[in-house]
Amino acid sequence: MVFLLCFFLVADVSYGINGDCELPKVVGPCRASHPRYYYNSSSKRCEKFNYGGCRGNANNFHTLEECEKVCGVRSRDSPKEN
């Protein structure tokens, strides 16, 4: 019984963040400049960046609120500019 409890606690911590949120920031090769947000796994915050418009990945959100909701960010610090 203790083993199962430990297993679920570890699983909860390990998988608490959506896997897409662990992807690196990808600006992409196109030349557009769309303001977007991505989850920075080092700072554990959603940060603003300019998306080029193509060949990005799933760690790319239209709003800070969407990024925080999907990636489980608890504190609402001001976003770090990149």
From Swiss-Prot:
Disulfide bonds join 21-71, 30-54, 46-67. One of its GO terms (cellular component) is nematocyst. SUPFAM superfamilies: BPTI-like. Keywords: Disulfide bond, Ion channel impairing toxin, Nematocyst, Potassium channel impairing toxin, Protease inhibitor, Secreted, Serine protease inhibitor, Signal, Toxin, Voltage-gated potassium channel impairing toxin. This is U-actitoxin-Avd3p. One of its GO terms (molecular function) is toxin activity. Serine protease inhibitor that inhibits both tissue and plasma kallikreins. Has hemolytic activity. Inhibits voltage-gated potassium channels (Kv). It comes from Anemonia viridis (Snakelocks anemone). Residues 1-16 form the signal peptide. Residues 76-82 form a propeptide. The record marks 31-32 as: Reactive bond. PANTHER family: BPTI_KUNITZ INHIBITOR DOMAIN-CONTAINING PROTEIN, KUNITZ-TYPE PROTEASE INHIBITOR-RELATED. Its main location: secreted. Residues 21-71 form the BPTI/Kunitz inhibitor domain. Belongs to the venom Kunitz-type family. Sea anemone type 2 potassium channel toxin subfamily. PROSITE patterns: BPTI_KUNITZ_1 (PS00280), BPTI_KUNITZ_2 (PS50279). It is found in: Secreted; Nematocyst.
